C-alpha cells in the first residue's frame, strides 16, 4: 500500500512555444517562390486532474519539478510545428491547489475528472509567411515562441466526508467505522493504530448513504503539532458533522470531551460550529451504575458549554453509550440515523445549489424563461414518439461539434455534476406521462451531453420504477472509456453513441473535443461498452460533405464500426442549422450512396432514419410552451418544428408569430435559412 502523503510542493513550468520558420519556396522553374515558413507549435500545459482511484500523493512525493514539452519549431512548406505534450498531475478528490509563494488558493478540486491548468504553454512563433506584405514579399525573419508560465505550487488533499470521527487514541473510532461501513482499517489495542485517515460508506437504503472519515487520534496539544493530530486535522474541515468518540473507561469523560473541542477550536473556530454527536464507547467494560454516572457527567458538561457558547453550536449533540463490538439492532439504527440526520441540512443545501438555471450563451446570462427538464413528445427520426429528458444546461458538452445546432461553445467539459435534482425531474416526468400517450421512448437528449449528469444511473433507476417505457441515452460516447460511466449506462435499454470520424485529424476537425479526450481512448470506450452492454446498441455516424464522406474517410470509419459491431448503424447528416458554415449536408442521393458503401463493407444493419409511421400518429396539439421548450434546446425552422411535432406548418407559423411579437422568440438567418431561437 502506498504511503499516505497529503501535502506536496513542486516547481511547475509549461512548455515554451516553438520558433517560427524562416523558409522560402525552392522549386524548379519557380524563381520567385516566396516565403513558406510555418508557425511554431504551442508549448504544452501543466494540468492537475482528479483521479478517483488515487487517495494520496504517494506516487509523486519524490518529484520536485513538472515541466511540459516545448512546441516544435515551424518548418518549410508552411508546415506548423507540433504542439508540445501536456503534463498531467493526477491527484485525489479533495485536492486544493495553492500558489506556494503567495499562499493563494488556485483551485479546489472536488469531482472525479475535474481539471485545472496550473501553467499554460507559450504560444508558438509566427513563420516568415505571416510577415509577407505588398512591400516586403520576402521577409527574412520570424517570431520566436513565447515562454511558458512558471510557478511554484503546493497540493493539499482534504478528505471529503459527511461525518468525521474525532477522539483520543485507542477509543474505538476504527472499530466504529468498521462496524458501520465496509471499511477495513487497522484495529489493535494500542494508541495510534490509525496512522492515516480511513474512509467508509454507510448505506441506509438505495437513496441514502453517507461517508465516514476516521481521523488519527488527537492528543492534547495537537493543534500546536503534538502527536499526529495537526497533520490530519485538515481532513475534518470538509466534514458535514463530527462524532466525538470517547472511551468510557477514562477517569473524567467530561474533561476528555472539553480537551477534544478545545483542540479543534485552537485549530479552527469553524470546526466547533459543526453539528456533533457523542459516542461513549466500551460500555462492556463498566458496571451500569458507572455508565449512568459518566453519561450524566458528560450531559452536564455539554449543557454548560452549550449555554455559555450558543454561537458556536447548532444544537446540543445527541449522546449514545454503547459497545462498538456489540453494536446492532435498535442501537445501530439510532446511531446511523443520527449520523444521517446531522447532515440533512447539508444535503438539502447541496440540492438547492445544484438547481442551476438554464444557461443559453457563453457569458452564462440567466434565462428569464421557465423551462422544463422533461419536454415533448417530439417526433424523432429514429425513435418515434420520444419524450425528452434534458439533464444538462445549455451547450454543456465534452465536444464543440461544428454541426451542433445549439451554436459554438469552446468551454468544453469532462467533469460530472448534478445540475438538476432527480426528484424534480421525476415529478415532471410523472406529469408528462399522465398527459401523453403512445410514447415509444424516454430519451436523454437536449441541451448537451447527458453523461455529464452525475446522478444519471440513479435517475434511470427511478424512471424504471414508474414506467415500462424503454429508456434511450443519446450520447457522443466521449466518456465511455471510463469504467464507471460504462457501468452507469448498463441499466438503459438503448444507447446511441456517435462516431463522426475514423482518424484523429478528422475527429478534431468535426468534434473539436475537450483536450482530455483522446481519439483512441474514445474508440476503445465504444468497443468495450459494446462488449458489456446487454441492451440495444445503435451507432450514429454523422456525415458532412467534403469532410468525412470520401472513400478514404468512410473506410476509416467502417474499420472501427466492424470492431464495435453495433446492432445498427444510423447514417445522418446536417438537416438542421449548424454552428459552422463548413458543416454542409449530403443530399439524398449522396446519403444513399454512402449507405450502399457501408452495406458493401460491413455486415451490420445500415439505416438512414426518417420520420416513422408510428410517430406520425401523434395527435397532441402543440402549444407555445411546447415550442419554447423545443427551441431552447434546438433552434430550428418552421418546417422542422412542424415535422418534430407532427403539426401543420400554418399552426406552427401562427404560434411563432405570437412568440416573436411577445419577445420570447427571435428570427435568425443562419446559412441563408430563416430559423427561430429563444431570447434570453
UniProtKB/Swiss-Prot annotation:
Keywords: 4Fe-4S, Cytoplasm, GTP-binding, Hydrolase, Iron, Iron-sulfur, Magnesium, Metal-binding, Nucleotide-binding, S-adenosyl-L-methionine. It is found in: Cytoplasm. Its cofactor is Mg(2+); [4Fe-4S] cluster. [4Fe-4S] cluster binds at residues 397, 401, 404. Gene3D superfamilies: Aldolase class I, GTP1/OBG domain, P-loop containing nucleotide triphosphate hydrolases. Residues 2-160 form the Obg domain. InterPro entries: Aldolase_TIM, G_OBG, GTP-bd, GTP-bd_Obg/CgtA, GTP1-OBG_CS, GTP1_OBG_dom, GTP1_OBG_dom_sf, GTPase_Obg. One of its GO terms (molecular function) is GTPase activity. GTP binds at residues 167-174, 192-196, 214-217, 281-284, 317-319. The keyword Transport does not apply. Residues 371-680 are annotated as: Radical SAM domain. One of its GO terms (biological process) is ribosome biogenesis. Its EC number is 3.6.5.-. Residues 161-336 form the OBG-type G domain. Mg(2+) binds at residues 174, 194. Residues 383-613 form the Radical SAM core domain. Its main location: cytoplasm. GO terms for cellular component: cytoplasm. HAMAP family: GTPase_Obg (MF_01454). Monomer. An essential GTPase which binds GTP, GDP and possibly (p)ppGpp with moderate affinity, with high nucleotide exchange rates and a fairly low GTP hydrolysis rate. Plays a role in control of the cell cycle, stress response, ribosome biogenesis and in those bacteria that undergo differentiation, in morphogenesis control. Belongs to the TRAFAC class OBG-HflX-like GTPase superfamily. OBG GTPase family. This is GTPase Obg.
